[in-house]
Amino acid sequence: GFTLYDLYSYNEKHNEKNGWNNTDGDNNGHSWNCGSEGETDDPNVNGLRRRLIKNAFAALLCSRGPAMFFAGDEFCNTQFGNNNAYCQDNIISWLDWSRLEEFKEIHDFVRHMIQFRKEHPILRKMTKPSSCQFPEISVHNGTPFNASTDYKTKLIGIMYAGRNEEDTEDDIVFYCMNAYWEPLVMQLPVLPNGKHWHVDTNTNAEYFDGEDFTAKTELLGVNTIRVPARTTIILVAE
């Protein structure tokens, strides 16, 4: 299949060099090139691709079960649209480590998400029931505890809640993803007294080399958040 980078860089497979007239490999990659097929210098296309890649890693590392991804996805390795590179012992299938410098932003983001996963045992189901009576997993499609599957919602929120391993406080994480091409507003669940929502991760935030991805912005007394187009926001209750 496609690498994660290629998933957002190619609409079609490009297996011509395999020698089968591009007839091999899966034809249903469900990919999107974000407006340009393959490599491009368009900053808008490249910016969107990076945001979607971050969204994918955020979803993976906020999911239950073992988190696995293809080697090189953490620095946007490419197979140039080839989704069946079994016969390519060359740059098509090799890991191009030079991309680590070009895509340091993605590499740093993946490191941040791995650390975030380690810090929140609820994402790994290493918790007891929460003391605040929130369910362990709940769905919030646009509004609190709205589990509707109506396609018009366009905005999904998933909240994890449990008692941490030391049994000292609740571990509450809210994952929110807007796949729509316009900004949308998410209504957040009201937290128990003394706790407030903090933004931990925003895949639309501007990146500065060496920045602290863990810096949080507190939402004092606010139970709504504007989610930019095609963006993931992760909040924690503190």
Predicted features and spans:
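Alpha-amylase-like alpha-glycosidases and glucanotransferases acting on alpha-linked glucans and related
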Residues: G1-N46, N141
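Carbohydrate-interacting/catalytic domains
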Residues: T40-K54, A59-F69, D73-E238
